[in-house]
């Protein structure tokens, strides 16, 4: 007789977990036994292909088992009800409640906690209890709360706290307006309107300028995401490490397009002391801030200039670098521009690329995978990003085919070389 699906799925979870534990032991990675304050594990931060694949498989199987156990009504009820947990968590973040809980793992009574943050104790108790039920904080003794490793992260990593705050405030409100944004013809790009704009009355970047406190939080959030969740920067670093120019001893001259304050170029300059960088941006304010915050030791190799994004790049812009490998770096620049704008921008490099030194245009941007590239529990993060870009900016995350078509439309002589990467580790959003 065939084994029932519940037992089969549970056995797959056990078998895969056993295999994962073996890999962790072979890699000398400690297995987390709990989520107490101070707990760390390489399991949470190691993203090699084998470990990540096993971890994701266990997660997917666990989700499947949960759906089988809950059934349609139970699953849907739980799926939508987490909205209330998100609202409760945002309240704790916005009122800095977690910062008032002792980081040494000891408890604090709700009355004391409420006094410290200036909130009514009876309301705060209910909010904390809901957050505790999902394991973010603990209530091991009635009315007394303590940290877990999860809430500890939200206190110690303010950038990540900003990311969670952004996700549980601006994006929640915007996503509630996605349906309304589609009640009339609403094409992508500049001709249409993002759900965020419908919800908040203006485009996201404008809204953050109008609300500088939220704008600062958003900037911190994006910096944290770039550092911790987005593999794009690491992919660029790996490309630079393996670049022909670097291997042959020919110094790199990297022009970072729309490089903002130059934080990433400064990071690259630290890693590669023989390379030099020019950070370009349309914003005089960002360029000024970049100059002010740059490490003085890097000042001779990291330069700044204000420049129009779409201005044509002539041969004389690279003629002084005949002994260098010149790279124009477009890091997350193209995703929010229409096809016409992307083509215009790519064509602006053509005169410079005709120079004998053969400059390179290095593009790191978002790609929407084709259907069924991954298992659904992995694909979910990519589809979430598809909808995120639609909701927040009314832009489309392009497929690899669409990117290739754009490059060919810009100039059929563009030779595209894709950098092979391990996709595991880029699924979080």
Swiss-Prot record:
Keyword Cell membrane recorded: no
Catalyzed reactions: (2'R)-atrovenetin + S-adenosyl-L-methionine = deoxyherqueinone + S-adenosyl-L-homocysteine + H(+)
Effects seen without this gene: Leads to decreased, but does not abolish, production of herqueinone.
Pathway(s) of this molecule: Secondary metabolite biosynthesis
UniProtKB keywords: Methyltransferase, S-adenosyl-L-methionine, Transferase
GO MF annotations in UniProt: O-methyltransferase activity
Leading EC class: transferase
Binding site for S-adenosyl-L-methionine: 285
BP GO terms, sorted: methylation; secondary metabolite biosynthetic process
Its EC number(s): 2.1.1.-
The protein, known as: O-methyltransferase phnC
Superkingdom: Eukaryota
One Pfam assignment: Methyltransf_2
Record keyword Ribosomal protein present: no
Similarity field: Belongs to the class I-like SAM-binding methyltransferase superfamily. Cation-independent O-methyltransferase family. COMT subfamily.
Chain's role: O-methyltransferase; part of the gene cluster that mediates the biosynthesis of phenalenones such as herqueinone, compounds that have been reported to treat tumors, bacterial infections and/or mycoses, and rheumatic diseases. The non-reducing polyketide synthase phnA synthesizes the heptaketide backbone and cyclizes it into the angular, hemiketal-containing naphtho-gamma-pyrone prephenalenone. The product template (PT) domain of phnA catalyzes only the C4-C9 aldol condensation, which is unprecedented among known PT domains.
Encoding gene per record: phnC
